[in-house]
């Protein structure tokens, strides 16, 4: 009997070990932080347990009244969730999980899914710390995913929770960041090298792409770039949309000075292999500890093209700029050389989005079966560690999917809540393995309800792009792999007379009556047409191939967590959550197991002997 009880206790311990993550307590340090308001009176700290799917927030506000924190969307505060708390004058605390019935009215949720960890007040500020599951079973709670989260913070001067525009703030944040740079290696011999445009006068135009060619650091032996960050001139930040650094082939003949990147002189558009990138809303980016961008060998670039996209919508005159990119490099070599692969839809007008579209999906295909031929050497598996997603103002979501032998394997990276004003490189939870012959598909979702004109692919902010940059290792000689649809097929499917000249077909499409039916017909034709895939090497060699857009199987949401603590498999097919299909369903035969706690190991030794005894005696 004692053995039976011991064995049952062991099973309970094992189940507990695998079902519980590391809970953060009232005073545990939290890795991430942001100010949520311009005056820096609202400060958020947070951390999460990815395996247990629990996130912990700590909101500190300069008020002695109520405070609130939640998640909203890009269109309206209505339906936003908001956890509200404060300290009464008598020292008692109040705390509840609520939601917004309208932009002014709060209502308490029927299910209280936020757990209070700490709520304090001093003469200046109120601090509220609480935790909640990534996904609750309460329809009034927004899911916490790897998408861009629009974090809502609100407060008041007293203890009567009431929304006011003056004290309400929304900030787009990647809550589920995978790496914290303070935990990463910062070599003692770090050297800094700045790549800056030289005293450039920003033109009085809505959009300018300025390019200049600059040398990389001159080193006598191999070094690794392990981090980059933007250099932004104070007061010019609102004009700089993105900064890109392209590696040049060492045989390239490069121009001098500063020129329009995509203007009349094609020399200023030379070099197309991105090695570092920043866009509006982003911060610095540091590679994982075992990878870096190689410089200093005969195979490495010696020069780069610095591209800065300016948006001077107010047409301000005489603004001088010296923005650019700061590189951090070291002689302490990492295990792998990092590469950057650009995927998506080729950036020219064959990519189009009709006006007045509630939703329009565009696709860019990449086929890797020619990589080895273009690389000039055998290509082994490559590992994707991070990605940077990029569209312009009409973009609403993006995702990159991986296929092998015609079967969808996984979503490599995605953002179903994309924000043009927050474009940061984001680390993946685990490296994604790409094998030779795999196909990669980029899907972009656009909305053009505010436009009465066609939107074409192009460099201007009012044009569109559909791009995802993969940071991967080990580096190969491929710089980009982009697709575009057969515009002749699309024109015919819309009932128009097609021309062999692609630009004439675009003029025809520009005159189509874009009813909802024609918008859907165009989207369907673009997806069903044969894709031309352009593969480019670092040395600007280009190879074409063709392919077809595969079907996309939506990833089901994972189970929700009830306020009682139990997980529930929802009976829905909403393609929302950050979680992939469970390993048992994905065809994988491997899984990473977490180590058992020591107490379970000790019980295991006794339980196995008891189990053997029970089997022998028939108990």
From Swiss-Prot:
Q: Which residues are glycosylated?
A: 250, 405, 477
Tissues with expression:
Expressed at low levels in thymus and testis.
Please tell me whether the keyword Zinc is annotated for this protein.
no
Residues binding Cu cation B are: 390, 392, 465
Q: Which cofactor does it need?
A: Cu(2+)
Which PROSITE patterns does this one have? DOMON (PS50836)
Q: Name one GO molecular function term.
A: dopamine beta-monooxygenase activity
Listed binding positions for Cu cation A are 241-242, 309
Q: Where's it mainly located?
A: membrane
InterPro entries in the cross-refs: Cu2_ascorb_mOase-like_C (IPR014784), Cu2_ascorb_mOase_N (IPR000323), Cu2_ascorb_mOase_N_sf (IPR036939), Cu2_monoox_C (IPR024548), DBH-like (IPR000945), DOH_DOMON (IPR045266), DOMON_domain (IPR005018), PHM/PNGase_F_dom_sf (IPR008977)
Every DOMON domain range: 40-156
Record-linked PANTHER family? DBH-LIKE MONOOXYGENASE PROTEIN 2-RELATED, DOPAMINE BETA HYDROXYLASE RELATED
Q: By what name is this protein known?
A: DBH-like monooxygenase protein 2
Q: Which organism is it from?
A: Mus musculus (Mouse)
- What taxonomic classification does the UniProt entry list for its organism? Eukaryota, Metazoa, Chordata, Craniata, Vertebrata
